[in-house]
């Protein structure tokens, strides 16, 4: 047997065994696939899973083929094959862990956000992978010297190839027929790009042409719009109302709506009784970047890239600067972090921007305390003859980092899981921040500024701990009410307190300030997607966004649109098995996502 032929045989068997190894690691993906109910979904999931693991297992071998053909030397080929296979294996381990935690796969943004400790673990995974792959590769190399007696390898390769082809054909059929139990599985496999050919199936008479039109609509929604920004659509016509009020915006990162109560947030609950509380308020995203964008701009966060590329601030911040507001901007987490990047969007072009909170003591709680002290100091040094805009962005809740000596909000039973412990730390951090924000409000009253200041307390998004039993935890993982429903409490001098039950969103905050504070007479549609919070309107649909996808949120359902497909979930965030696309809402959303491009 020639060296080249033996190396090709070794590479093929090495790929098959690597596919089996990856399948063992990848079983974690199947664990979270909630739609495995109909038999067709079971069959497809198994075929797609085996086919994709085969593709990933064979990828190092395919990269090795040119080397084997040109330089058939075992001492060169085997080490390269082991390193490539180890890289794929360590990637799979990391991706499965990320997916289990966040329900999305590893991407460029994920690598940018990895902590140094995670990089250390990734290096450890790689070294362990090298050891495993080296032993596996040497064992296969020894076995490859024995001439094959049966054609097991050919039959095995044929079977895996059939799995690959059959799964892609099944997906093409399922997508054309909107069969969600099959199409929903796409997002569970890493680097999986199944066949999509609805148009050809329609030409062959295998599917309804109407289904193809629906598919085109979703495909259009999944593509980011292109073009130059046209923002605002018309020059602003504003005449501020004198004397001009101060504005204080307090954002508690990841504070969800249902924690605003006397047990966990007594100070803010007391504040809400003398203010306007919006009970059905939603963020524009399930992560900080999208939530903060919708809060400052009043636009869907699908525009984030376009504004960030130009460092284009919102008209709200332009007006604060135009009318000589003093800006007291204090964020616990760095404004330049990849998570939010406020320095490229809402706080862009601000001279001497305070970019981060520096604390000699590690931890979000320590930074939050320093942030508050620096706010007090700034407030005492400001020019009292000019109005101010204050922005306080607290971080302890989203980081699950209350002070070490702070009494826990709920007890943690012995042997509790990590997420049970996180839930306790989250609630404790909320209680800690409630007290901290309460002192900020007391300080305003002591300085006799509360009657001349619009005070807004809200959050950028919520937080989930698998209360729905769907396996979603944290934030940025789902468009459920737990991650989208946020508190909003506003005390506006001269307006009576009350509770608003109609649906509102972050998109409505900027239009409210422009109309009521700056006296802008433009229709809100000139610069935002929302309406004034003090109007009688409510949204019938809302565009929610995350880092990787977006959703059309309606009162009774959520349509999640991803680059590789879509899924529809009900109010309890359960997957809808045979959905009907909300065509009217999707077309309106598509128009809104393109309205501010030329």
Regions found by a protein language model. Give the residues of each.
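Transmembrane and membrane-interface helices of multi-pass
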Residues: 1-193
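A solvent-exposed, charged loop/short amphipathic helix patch at secondary-structure junctions
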Residues: 406-427
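Short beta-strand segments
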Residues: 251, 282, 329-331, 388-396, ...
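Substrate-binding rim/cap in mid-to-C-terminal beta-strand-loop elements of soluble/periplasmic
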Residues: 286-297, 472-526
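Active-site rim elements
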Residues: 43, 47-49, 303-307, 361-363, ...
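Phosphate/adenylate-binding glycine loop and adjacent helical scaffold
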Residues: 527-598
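Histidine-centered active-site microenvironments of extracellular/periplasmic hydrolases
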Residues: 445, 449-494, 539
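Active-site-proximal alpha/beta segments of enzymes that process anionic O-linked groups
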Residues: 163-413
């Amino acid at each position: 047997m020639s060296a080249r032929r033996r190396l090709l045989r070794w590479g093929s068997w090495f790929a098959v065994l690597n596919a089996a190894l990856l399948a063992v690691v990848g079983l974690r993906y199947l664990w979270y696939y909630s739609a495995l109910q109909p038999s067709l979904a079971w069959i497809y999931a198994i075929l797609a899973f085996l086919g994709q693991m085969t593709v990933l297992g064979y990828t190092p071998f395919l990269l090795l083929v040119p080397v084997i053909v040109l330089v058939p030397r075992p001492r060169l080929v085997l080490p390269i094959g082991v390193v490539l296979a180890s890289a794929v294996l360590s990637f799979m381990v990391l991706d499965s862990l990320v997916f289990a935690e966040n329900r999305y796969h590893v991407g460029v943004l994920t690598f940018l956000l990895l902590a140094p400790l995670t990089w250390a673990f990734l290096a450890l995974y790689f070294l362990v992978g090298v050891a495993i792959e080296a032993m596996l590769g040497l064992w296969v190399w020894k076995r490859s010297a024995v001439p094959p007696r049966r054609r097991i390898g050919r039959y095995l390769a044929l079977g895996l190839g059939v799995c690959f082809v059959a799964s892609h054909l099944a997906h093409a059929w399922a997508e054309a027929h909107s069969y969600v139990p099959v199409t929903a599985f796409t997002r569970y496999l890493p680097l999986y790009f199944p066949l999509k050919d609805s148009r050809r199936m329609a030409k062959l008479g295998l599917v309804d042409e109407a289904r193809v039109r629906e598919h085109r609509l979703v495909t259009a929604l999944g593509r980011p719009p292109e073009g130059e920004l046209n923002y605002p659509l018309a020059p602003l016509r504003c005449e501020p109302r004198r004397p001009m009020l101060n504005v204080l915006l307090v954002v508690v990162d990841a504070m969800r709506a249902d924690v605003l109560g006397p047990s966990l947030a007594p100070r803010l609950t007391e504040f809400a009784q003398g203010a306007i509380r919006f009970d059905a308020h939603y963020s524009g995203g399930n992560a900080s970047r999208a939530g903060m964008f919708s809060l400052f701009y009043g636009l869907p966060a699908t525009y984030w890239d376009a504004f960030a590329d130009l460092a284009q601030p919102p008209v709200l911040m332009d007006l604060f600067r135009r009318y000589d507001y003093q800006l007291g901007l204090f964020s616990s987490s760095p404004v330049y972090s990849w998570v939010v990047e406020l320095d490229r969007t809402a706080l862009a072009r601000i001279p001497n921007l305070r970019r981060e909170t520096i604390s000699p003591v590690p931890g979000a709680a320590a930074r939050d305390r320093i942030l508050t002290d620096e706010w007090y100091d700034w407030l005492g040094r400001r020019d009292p003859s000019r109005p101010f805009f204050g922005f306080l962005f607290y971080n302890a809740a989203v980081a699950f980092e209350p002070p070490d000596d702070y009494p826990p909000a709920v007890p943690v039973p012995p042997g509790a899981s990590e997420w049970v412990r996180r839930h306790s730390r989250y609630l404790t951090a909320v209680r800690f921040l409630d007290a901290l924000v309460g002192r900020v409000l007391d300080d305003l009253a002591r300085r006799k500024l509360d009657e001349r200041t619009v005070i807004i307390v809200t959050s950028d998004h919520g937080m989930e701990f698998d209360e729905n039993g769907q396996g979603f935890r944290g934030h940025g993982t789902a468009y459920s009410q737990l991650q989208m429903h946020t508190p909003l409490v506003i005390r506006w001098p001269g307006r009576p307190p009350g509770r608003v039950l109609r649906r509102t969103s972050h998109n409505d905050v900027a239009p409210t300030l422009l109309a009521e504070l700056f006296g802008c007479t433009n229709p809100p549609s000139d610069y935002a997607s929302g309406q004034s919070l003090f109007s009688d309107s409510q949204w019938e649909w809302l565009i929610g966004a995350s880092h990787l996808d977006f959703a059309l949120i309606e009162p009774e359902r959520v349509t999640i649109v991803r680059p590789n497909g879509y899924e529809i979930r009900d109010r309890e965030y359960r997957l809808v098995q045979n959905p009907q696309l909300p065509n009217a809402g999707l077309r309106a959303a598509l128009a809104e996502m393109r309205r501010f491009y030329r």
